[in-house]
Amino acid sequence: DFTTPEQGTIVEGDVYVLVIDAVTQRLKYLVEDLRVINDYADQKILEGTMQRTIGNEQVRLVVLANLNQNQIQGVSEGMQAYLNTMVGNTAVEIYNKLVYNYTGPTPWNLAERRLPMWGISPATGVPPAGPSLECKLYRAVAKVSLWVNGKQGLQDTKGDFIITGITVNNANDKGYCVSQATLSPDETIQYQSPYVTGLSMKPQNFVYTGLNVTMAYEDLIYLPEQENNDSGAVSLDVTYTYGGETKTKTIEFRKDGVGDRFEVVRNHVYIFNVSSI
């Protein structure tokens, strides 16, 4: 999925670099003086001070972003302080504790709630001059888009097809900031399955009202990961006007409305195209 500038926003004070021992997989320390430099096109540059490694010692850098606005369970004194309490824990133990909440009737709004993201660097030593590393960041949520006839719109003699409301049914209310599902080496695939192990979910609905969509509604609907079983499956109720009538139809998370359901997987976009009525 392509990322818009708004989706890729990272700000100082809400990005964290964890230095993980490459052998033991335990957290050694956090980079405390982290700075974000945004003057590099579509890249984000993070600068900070690291401790030199000794001999053959290697570390990996875990980058976590946009946690403050996402109601991380168990956090009361701020994320940096919370993460510092986990020095000595394994990366997996830390990941299991980083659960964001998405509750209430209000849909996700990027102006008020940045998207939680995670990435990890290759193993490296830290020379006196410091390492220069790259990593890709993966969003902890999936994205849903609705197109009308391939974003060309639909018309008849009585006017345009207009989407006036969307209800997301049975969305999960939380998710892990970091997935422990296997990350594919193929960047076009990324994650292939959701990771929701151990989470107790409460299904909920989100309502988008007052819409006037004739071409596309995209980059606005975000969902936690979900094993999309027949019992309580996520779906979209789309209310529209066309041909002088107002109707509501349900869109299932299936290819062409039939077959097996799509699971909801982070960092993927699910595009549903309304091509005919």
Give the role of each language-model region.
Residues 81-143, 147-151, 256-277:
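Extracellular beta-sheet/turn segments enriched in Thr/Pro/Gly and aliphatic residues
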